[in-house]
């Protein structure tokens, strides 16, 4: 309720106690993978009379997980397991999900102790320029992103915004 139309998502956001239990399940290893369900909508649509469900999530997934780790609620080692290794194994994506010789070098470099927050207007990529996490404190900041060995983001700059993805068949 505190987010108003900005928090309209499916399934709906739950009470804090339910979210805390989900974090505890993640910490116990009961959760196989984490995804962002990135569903952004422009400000004008979310402020309209019938706001659509969804919110941006891909840019805040890692900062949320890093903050949980900094707070001691999950381990840092768990983050690449549930965001990379296990999803690649579950979907049969070869040469992905680990950092090994011969694998795709897709990774994020972070400053694990940096305290920061998303300021209004910071989101420069995608179809919406807002975040449900605006002004909320994070601990741990993504500093650079590599895709298949190439930097896409570093030093607060995007090096490429064109489509870089490739179609992957799951096994």
Describe the residue ranges of each PLM region.
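Short beta-alpha connecting loops at secondary-structure transitions
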Residues: 7, 46-51, 128-132
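Short acidic, glycine/serine/threonine-rich loops at helix termini
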Residues: 1-2, 44-47, 120-122
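A generic local structural motif
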Residues: 18-22, 95-96, 131
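His/Asp/Glu-enriched, well-ordered alpha-helical/loop segment
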Residues: 27-34, 39-112
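Electropositive phosphate-/nucleotide-binding environments in soluble metabolic enzymes
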Residues: 3, 12-20, 52-62, 77, ...
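C-terminal cap of metal-dependent C-N hydrolases
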Residues: 101-168
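Histidine/acidic residue-rich metal-binding segments in metalloenzymes
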Residues: 1-34
